[in-house]
């Protein structure tokens, strides 16, 4: 595959994944400790509305990063080349992030969104957030692997 096409896939993968990466790292480093200082009502309302917007807009960005990374891995030759291998490592990081999001974070997001939309504070509001918090470092770590591998793959391009 031509170098401009590989560079385009790499740029698209980096830009899209970078949005998700930045969001999760922000929540791991800033939002999580700040939210621990808030009351359940404020936390539920703010996070419920954030998740309502985020869970509508972020899937397109995440899917773009995932597909561009998969395309880069395939177009660069997969395990047979250094660029392809690095792109596959990035893909593994993205898939790990997605799996953890779907299994743990998304159900919490949906519960918080429903609570905020109906203006109710669930009795387990803090437990819900603790569940979400329990995987944010893993998600951010998986995305760090993905971003690092994508950057390294990009440096390998001619």
Positions of PLM-derived features:
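Interfacial segments of alpha-helical transmembrane regions
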Residues: 4-18, 74-96
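Interfacial loop at the N-terminal end of multi-pass membrane proteins
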Residues: 7-8, 17-64, 109, 113-130
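Internal alpha-helical transmembrane segments of multi-pass membrane proteins, especially GPCRs
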Residues: 11, 52, 88, 130-133, ...
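Core segments of transmembrane alpha-helices
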Residues: 60-72, 139-148
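Mid-bilayer segments of alpha-helical transmembrane spans in multi-pass integral membrane proteins
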Residues: 95-104
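Juxtamembrane boundary at the C-terminal end of a transmembrane helix
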Residues: 151-158
């Amino acid at each position: 595959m031509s170098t401009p096409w590989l560079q385009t896939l790499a740029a698209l993968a980096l830009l899209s994944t970078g949005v998700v990466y930045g969001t999760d790292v922000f929540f791991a480093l800033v939002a999580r400790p700040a939210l621990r200082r808030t009351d359940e009502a404020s936390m539920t309302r703010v996070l419920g509305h954030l998740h309502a917007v985020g869970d509508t807009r972020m899937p397109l960005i995440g899917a773009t990063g995932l597909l561009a990374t998969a395309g880069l891995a395939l177009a660069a030759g997969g395990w047979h080349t250094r660029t392809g291998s690095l792109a596959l490592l990035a893909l593994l990081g993205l898939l790990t992030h997605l799996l953890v999001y779907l299994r743990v974070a998304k159900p919490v997001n949906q519960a918080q969104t429903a609570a905020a939309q109906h203006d109710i504070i669930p009795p387990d509001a803090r437990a819900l957030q603790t569940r979400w918090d329990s995987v944010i470092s893993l998600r951010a770590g998986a995305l760090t692997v993905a971003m690092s591998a994508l950057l390294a793959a990009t440096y390998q391009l001619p």
